[in-house]
Amino acid sequence: MPTRRLLMRQVREILKLRLDVGLSNRIIAKQLGVGETSVRDTLKRLHREGLTWPLPDTISDRELEQRLYGTPGKKAGRRKQSEPDWSAVARELKRKHVTLQVLWEEYIARDPDGFRYSRYCELFRNWHGRLPLVMRQSHAGGEKLFVDYAGDKVAVVDRKTGVVRDAHIFVAVMGASSLSFALATWSEQLPDWIEAHNAAYRFFGGVTQLLVSDNTKCAVIKACHFDPMVNRSYTDMARHYSTAVFPARPRKPRDKAKVENCVGIVERWLLGRLRNRTFYSLADLNKAIADLITRLNDERVIRQYGKTRRALFDELDAPNLKPLPAEPWVHAEWRRCRVGIDYHIELSRHFYSVPYRFARSEVEVRYTIRTVEIFLGGDRIAAHVRGSSNGRHTTVAVHMPPNHQRYREWTPAKIRSEAKRIGPMLRVLVDRIIEKRAHPEQGYRACVGIIGLERRFGVDRLEAAAQRALEFQVLNYPGIKSILEKELDRLPRSERLEQEPIQHSNLRGSEYYH
């Protein structure tokens, strides 16, 4: 089968993780869910086209795709990968501290296009006929931050109502030094999960190369041994901090041994000391947690190293952390929407415009508590300030087709002013039409049309038609136009604006329904 072409947002992410963050092709491939060959191919194409990173701001996704891929040529033949001398590998494994990981790294340094680690191990096991080896856990300074939630919860009592609510304990642990952070949140949902990460990064004062999480639902949409599907909002947060999410493999406890061990320590260190205390707010609980975490990090000595976690952090992790961005990450979520024929998308009962030529298109919407961004094919086509969920419309004038834009000149004040100029009955009619509609904006066009009837029928007849319309509750443009065309405005009419109810045998009284 032909190789599936990468999306341009994936291409940009590959370039960022490789050229900014400095991750290996293998880690980038796992992080983005693409083949390692695709990562290498993307970097080769970038070099071939003479492009530099960061890419120019003026280059769009469409132009980048044309530059990198252009017109497909002949498919290059696949070079046969060189196979190691397995007997030599077996001899080296008998030496102290030598693992398959070490030997594979030496092999891949000699042959960068050689087998990936998993395939390398598989071929060796096939040759030797032995069981899989366990990879030794070793964490370089500033390389990994492990995150998870503790299993046990802490009760928080509402002082006014007495209602008890459970708080969840988020834990983050540095890979090399075991410096620990904990925070109580109301849930393990994505917004709380993201905010806990923001707090953790502020606590550590820097960012690691990798972010290792358990396969919690708010982080990983679909757990997989080889290619987990990471939540897009979580990936966006990692991109903001110039790190990469690296989920632990399912049913592989050694992948998350550091954080699992620390969770146990935190549960014993924190929860045991908090068991007899009553907390009346999340802030009170987090203050108590912060005090105990400070004691754990700064006072308790790790016997095998003879140093505290804080001392190890200052020595191993801190010098290798990347700086924090200027602003913390603002949680954003993604949703697919279809643009309506009125060139608006609906999000939480509020409507946002896009350029009218994109009507009926399927788009992606990225939204925070403050902003709404709309994307089509990776390009942003509209951006708005987040509106309240009240069924209203947020419309940008340039998004409207030309025949709609002229209505933008008619503000509510101008509509009422023009109606008052024609006569008091028309002013009342305009107010009634606007009040009747669920959304006032829906009545503006009808009012503009009614006011425009002055040119055809004159001021006096339009004012008379407005009075008759009010008598018979005709509150729409077609009804007013019909009154004028049929000259009903010339007929004698009651001086009263309200008609007596019609009485006949087909009308049922209120008692009918009781």
Curated annotation (Swiss-Prot):
Keywords assigned by UniProt, alphabetized: DNA recombination, DNA-binding, Plasmid, Transposable element, Transposition
Residue span(s) of domain HTH IS408-type: 11-93
Gene3D superfamilies in the cross-refs: Ribonuclease H-like superfamily/Ribonuclease H
Segments forming domain Integrase catalytic: 128-317
Coiled coil: none
InterPro entries on file: HTH_IS408/IS1162_type, Integrase_cat-core, IstA-like_C, RNaseH-like_sf, RNaseH_sf
UniProt GO BP: DNA integration; DNA recombination; transposition
Pfam family for this entry, one: Mu-transpos_C_2
Gene Ontology MF term list: DNA binding
Membership in a protein family: Belongs to the transposase IS21/IS408/IS1162 family.
Name of this protein: Putative transposase y4uI
